[in-house]
């Protein structure tokens, strides 16, 4: 049909989802979808109308508008479809094609009534009218489905639903509103009412055919329902007694006890199992669980106490009987909490809800067993045929009702026996409004689950007969097995905990005595020392195995607790390599870093668990890579495409709770002395506090260890601070060129206790736990691990972990706003409070004492700054020759070097701008330079990868009067292969210099040009003589040692970071945490910028270093050229920023290099040494130190370095008062040997240990550290420790074992803290237990720190130094980990 037909009848109202057509006013007044304004304005022309008509008729589904008429004039209130008829107003071509078989020849659909004129099938008319009424009631569209024969209009039979004879129609009926139509449309014979109108309801309809593939599931459901209906009909009608007999036989033969009651709880049927177990046939009695279940006070209940009770009103008489209790099967006498089963049963009867409980039922032999008792209500309607007997329906399966209703349903089951042959799919399910031959779930209000009222009860013509079908399933064996499993898990955990302690105790003795023996017996031969080393290696391997087993057990029990802290990702990579560097060195394995330092900022995560995974992977690569192989280790930010599935409370922030600071008053009063003993006061506060240096250490959830007698913690004053940021992932990788993994061994690679080669002749050992633990840890950390491998060529392992990326600019702004709200403080605190220092502005240098790569360059001697000449950068010809046969190493080092060149250039330009503008460096901003390969030929520092053009470069530079500034970075393998070529090239340079010198003499020039040429060998060896006394930079090559080497040995970088600008640099660094006003007003800053500062210790080498840069030539200020291939001295030495910064004081306990510290290594070269005694007033010195204590001694004092470029210390806490530092963040006095610890840090020490072996180890350790044996007190239990303190003398430190007889360590600590809350000793827990709960127990009892055995001597020394620092101020340490 065309849209233009019957224009007077077309009145389609358009809303947001329909089309409105209104042709009453104009023939052109048609509309397109969504263009109502154009339609109302009558702007459509005939062409557009025709186009709309064509589109409407081309739609491949039935579509149109129809009106519903109420023939009974009931205002659409009657629900009977016989009182209604509908007329098609407008329909498309598809509608006509689908219904034309029912129409008279030449008759269309539009304008005709469905029943009176078109004679459509009755079931079709009824279905459409009922759904129109539904849409009218709900005031929204309804969806329904119905079947139809392809070739006729007969009513579909259910047998043909899924045959080829049937097509299914999916239809939508949408109520559009009411319209007024002429009365003659309804009654055409009436001519008197031509002007009268009647209301009709207008609907928009669509109908489309659904493919049969979508009904496979419905076909199975229909088949199942048909079978179920057949079974129910046979039971209802009782047509075959044999079937009923067989059915009852099934009930009698199943192992469950089956019973049936009426809606009052009266038993109608019990099967044989019920009778056999309970010994009584309870048919005809009211079900009383109290009489057949266990009773706490009366085990011999009378089972027949209700036998004579046949009154329905008395069905609750026994509800007050003594109720049974739930008892564990493995106990001899039940004593658990009593439960009133009868009350629960009567409640289920009343509310018509499922009854399900575990009940301990007593057999006729007196045995008690656990049964799962389940009962479901079943409703069978009586269809008004009183003569027909109601069958007693009995269910034969335990979970029979689960088929019809889910476990959480509060409804009951109804079987409607209306034999209706027109099943319809309503909302994609086979159903219809109040027409249904399938079971329907109704709620307690007699409503269907779809919200409509159930017609069974609403009509009042049917009576409901409710039956309760129940089963009792014996679960005693399962419950007993579950208890056994739980007990086994507990026993396993206890066994592991006990074995951990028992294995660590002798292992601690082995490692302790061996360590003491190897370090305190100089008369040992080399073979004996090698034997000690072998013992230590075996003990370490055994310790790793014990730790792996413990980790695996904790992972299996989900007891791993992630301890989040703030760290640099590059720190994890470097630490992991450091752990295995000695093993790699033995096999001459090149470990190459692929790290972009300026792209990896601080993150928050579990530092040590991530490092554990990476260490396992590197360890495998070292093990399976042949000698002279290569291992690549790297990290980067992973940009995931799919959101993480890990649960978290926020996606853009983390919430950290900070306890109240009860001890703030102690912080500001102990910062005025510049001695070592109070440089750590900032870390002694037991609770976190916020200051303008950042965040001090706070508590971390379960690590609140100080005893409640120290502080009564008030939860109401806790602060919850939101740290902005986002979650993301880090990608780590370890790539080697080892033996690879064969295909047959890959599937078991991550299995526990397995290797790809598990044969008895396998070449490589190992427990097979490392990768299994790594797999589970990465999953626990929100990531995963995977690998690629090719046999004989190597393997590459990658893993992802989820971390939190703090938003540092936002954090800094929040600190700044908080500082602006604080009141003005006294003058001496201006530096600490004027402006906050952002977290990432505290930059660390690898030249610190914690570094494993240090510069040990003996030819570098410090000069007085005032005597240091200024280098003209424009007069330098600076080249770095990177010579290596390993292209991967060249690419990695080139990236770093180009980054430093770019930073130096930016810094140089910035300094030039400041000098030109005559401004003071009072403010600075930290910039981040992306690490890219800089190939600009105009830059002043260039990188070359061969020496072929060195003669041309040197000759050109010398002829132009420039100074040669060459640094040769030569890998050892390249040196071994091309040493002659390198020597020849440097001899050529020397000859060119000599020729130029002779020409200068002829020209009578007084000043000779001084050149700077250095050789740095990248090697595993420490011997400089092998390489012609060159500087040695030990492999693996790290970021900061290489940077320090370049900055120290190239004049270009020295000219930029010259100590001549030391005052400007310091002022620049301070400006990040000091306002301009405080800089100008603080006398201490003025004194500092006037260079009234002496640095007695420029620490160039650290005692803890493993990798050194060695140069044995001590030539400073020499004016005569030496043999170039042997001489690497520079005539004018300027300090690199990293070296300069190591002398600054800090409150960080990791560094004790202080201004005017008399205990440091003597160094006769001081900065402005002649001004060292200008300030005779100690207060001025103290003020200077006070101000400098706000800065990290390892900071890089230049603005060219981004916060991400130096990441070498242990992971600092995120806003340091939010979280704890977890390990050894205490002063490491590397300027004194371990043997001097007792002399410099004298303490009265008590050892509380019941093991004589451990007492001996502790005694040897302490005497080795310099403590006198006669001053060490030994006790064997906690009570003796308490008695000694109370009756003899107080001690400074107690090394407290956790497990001791009589009184254990935790109990003894608690008593000591109660007795001496403020003057007690510093207690260090020494225990062989390694579980988190053991650590928490120690810390919560009041111990100051916790160390797991075996304890190493250097770690013990660190803790004793910490104790001395605290005891020297007569304070008690209340922090778990400082």
Curated annotation (Swiss-Prot):
Q: Has UniProt tagged this entry with the keyword Nucleotide-binding? A: yes
Instruction: Supply one GO CC term from the record.
Output: plasma membrane
State one molecular function term (GO). phosphorelay sensor kinase activity
In its record, the post-translational modification comment is: Activation probably requires transfer of a phosphate group between a histidine in the kinase core (transmitter) domain and an aspartate of the receiver domain.
Bias (Basic residues) occurs at 697-714
Name the InterPro entries for this protein.
CheY-like_superfamily, HATPase_C_sf, His_kinase_dom, HisK_dim/P_dom, HisK_dim/P_sf, PAS, PAS-like_dom_sf, Sig_transdc_His_kin-like_C
Q: What region holds the Response regulatory domain?
A: 1244-1364
Q: Which GO terms describe its biological process?
A: phosphorelay signal transduction system
From the UniProt record, list the coiled-coil ranges.
212-242
> Biased composition, Polar residues: where in the chain?
1188-1206
Q: Where is this region: Disordered?
A: 294-337, 663-717, 905-924, 1103-1213
Which reaction(s) does its UniProt entry say it catalyses?
ATP + protein L-histidine = ADP + protein N-phospho-L-histidine
Domain Histidine kinase intervals: 498-805
Going by the UniProt record, its keywords in alphabetical order are: ATP-binding, Coiled coil, Kinase, Nucleotide-binding, Phosphoprotein, Transducer, Transferase, Two-component regulatory system
Q: Which residues carry this modification: 4-aspartylphosphate?
A: 1297
Cite the record's Low complexity compositional bias ranges: 298-337, 663-696, 1103-1119, 1136-1187
- Residue ranges occupied by any PAS domain in the UniProt entry: 243-314
Q: What does this protein do?
A: Acts as a receptor histidine kinase for a signal transduction pathway. This protein undergoes an ATP-dependent autophosphorylation at a conserved histidine residue in the kinase core, and a phosphoryl group is then transferred to a conserved aspartate residue in the receiver domain.
Q: Which PANTHER family match?
A: OSMOSENSING HISTIDINE PROTEIN KINASE SLN1, TWO-COMPONENT HISTIDINE PROTEIN KINASE
Question: What's the protein called, per UniProt?
Answer: Hybrid signal transduction histidine kinase H
Gene giving rise to this polypeptide: dhkH
